[in-house]
């Protein structure tokens, strides 16, 4: 939206794409959603992280995008239904090789490209954790806000898994 315009190429922390519309302490906002998740229990929506824009060494997008995104969404739906397994990693569950339908795009998404798409770059994730800690401190805590302890605990657990 026009309300969310920012500098191009600069990481913008925007919780749930709601930053322009959160009219109170973001820590309270997060706490509300954490509480909602607890109330919903097993009925809470599953959360998935997808990077449609991962690039190779030459700056080319590795995933074809557009309608082919449905191939990943199909895997997500199957995970939600409990009809397909996943590989547990430090950052969560990833598709097992062969579980994303690549029929018809084998020339675009080769086994080597798929390996790169599913690769967990621990150093990159550790940098992300450091950036999140900086964001929590400088952009929220130092400005009078607060962070729910559960979010800090999740960062700590993620960092611990990455260090194994």
Language-model region placement:
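Conserved NTP phosphate-binding and transfer environment spanning the P-loop NTPase/kinase superfamily
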Residues: 1-164
């Amino acid at each position: 939206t026009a309300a969310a315009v920012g500098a191009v190429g600069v990481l913008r922390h925007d919780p749930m794409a709601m930053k322009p519309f959160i009219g109170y302490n973001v820590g309270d906002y997060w706490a509300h959603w954490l509480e909602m998740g607890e109330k919903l229990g097993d009925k809470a929506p599953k959360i998935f992280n997808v990077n449609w824009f991962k690039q190779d060494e030459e700056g080319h997008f590795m995933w074809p995008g557009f309608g082919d995104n449905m191939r990943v969404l199909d895997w997500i739906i199957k995970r939600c239904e409990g009809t397909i397994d996943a590989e547990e990693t430090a950052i969560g569950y990833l598709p097992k090789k062969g579980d994303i339908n690549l029929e018809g795009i084998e020339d675009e998404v080769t086994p080597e490209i798929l390996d790169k798409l599913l690769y967990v770059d621990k150093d990159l994730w550790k940098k992300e954790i450091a950036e999140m800690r900086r964001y929590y401190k400088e952009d929220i805590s130092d400005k009078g806000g607060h962070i729910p302890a559960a979010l800090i605990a999740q960062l700590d657990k993620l960092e611990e898994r990455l260090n194994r």
